[in-house]
Amino acid sequence: MVTVCDIRGMVCQKFPEKCAESWDNPGLQLGRGDARVNRVLTALELTPAVVAEAISWGAQLVLTHHPFIFKPIKVMNDDTPEGRMLLDLAEHKIALLAAHTNLDSAPHAIAEKLADDLELCNRKPFLSHEPYATYKIVVFVPKTDAETVAQAMHAKGAGCVGQYTNVSFRGCGTGHFTCGQGSHPAIGTPGTSETVEEIRLEMVVSERDLRAVTRALHQAHPYEEPAFDVFKLESEVHGLTDLYGFGMEGDLPAPMTLRALIAHIKQIWDIPSLRAAGNADQMVSRVAFVNGAGAKFISNARGIDALITGDCGHHDFDNAIRRGIALIDAGHYETEKYIPQILAQTLMDSAFGNELEVQIAREMRNPFEVY
């Protein structure tokens, strides 16, 4: 039996949520972690058409790239399109999971796919991933409840180290306490002293998940006042951020003009038209790209002739021209339309692959057209 929590853990193993940007909101957006899953629909983003397809196909989980929920929701009702979509998913017991900038920055994901298409050599991440604060959380829990508390913490992102999930240390010990007269103890009675066989449970947790993990700990722990400690680690967990970065840069197989590079991009990614700034006859040897919206990173460009990305504005093109860098707007959708396939392949290649039916949403398209 595969659960939503199992799939989230596997996705986190491949695309650690710790490596998401601080403003991002990946992870489980809707649904119960213990819900069973045998059908998963992957999509770039959640749309009414994707919701309808998930319901029609009988999916129990929709796995998207773009998180549907970015900001706190004040109301969820059928007065808004967003509310209706979430209600439709909830009423059909369909969970919603997202892997966004944690996927964008991961090795062997979209950056590698686009670099392979361009046949880049001498590759390296265009933007190295900045490490985020890591904490160790230590909680003391009765031996009989240790697994329940551990699973609740894992479900909120604790215990992810590199390519491993559900990582913890457990040691046996003895807890001692005296119950106050106004207490409501799970073990013992008010006014008595108790000695309990307990487990010391330790896990690492990222700064962005710390609040959710401590909340889950409180909810799952049998004690009225759980005893736990949180320590900030002075060194980052090895292997978690050193291989991660946004985009890729590298050398083309052979120098070509900007005009020829544009024609090549249109052909390999099936793009009818695109926008670009720069001298069409200039020679281009080393290029960089950032899938999605990466024009804000022009100032980070060093030693490249052209930057390929999407969602470029007037001032982005002007900035690139001033810096002597060709800027190619290949489109947000066009540079990310392969991600649902990457998500689907990740599921099929996982330990749960034989237990899951995975389908890529058919109703995906660029939200706008060029006339």
Predicted regions located by residue number:
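Hydrophobic structural segments
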Residues: M1-Y371
